[in-house]
């Protein structure tokens, strides 16, 4: 998930308030090492219901490790039906803990910036 590649797909979810309307988000994702770096420290999840970008920080190895650790924790959002906000918050906290737990003897500690959306099936209807 960290090397340059593309992901394209579609997802569906039931819309209880309007049985004839089913949201079908279309999505794509890609990452690229760019011109300045030799190692890609970025990654993403693009599997419904989670669409998340992670930007690793802390130098080549540290940034890459941080991205992998964060994506490892956040990956649980792709295998479940999200029915409450706490599930997302707890998963992001687990990702932060996974990054913090990475040992580092370098000048810069590993870190990661996480941004994304999760399609949640709340009692009042689907929401991002």
Protein language model regions, located:
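PP2C/PPM-type serine/threonine phosphatase catalytic domain
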Residues: 1-128
């Amino acid at each position: 998930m960290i090397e340059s590649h593309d992901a394209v797909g579609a997802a569906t979810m039931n819309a209880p308030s309007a049985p004839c309307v089913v949201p079908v988000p279309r999505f794509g994702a890609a990452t690229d090492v760019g011109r300045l770096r030799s190692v890609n420290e970025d990654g993403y999840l693009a599997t419904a219901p989670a669409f998340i970008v992670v930007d690793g920080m802390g130098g080549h190895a540290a940034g890459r490790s941080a991205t992998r650790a964060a994506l490892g924790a956040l990956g649980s959002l792709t295998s479940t039906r999200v029915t409450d906000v706490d599930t997302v918050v707890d998963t992001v906290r687990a990702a932060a803990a996974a990054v913090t737990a990475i040992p580092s003897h370098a000048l810069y500690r590993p870190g990661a910036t996480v941004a994304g959306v999760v399609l949640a099936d709340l009692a009042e209807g689907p929401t991002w």
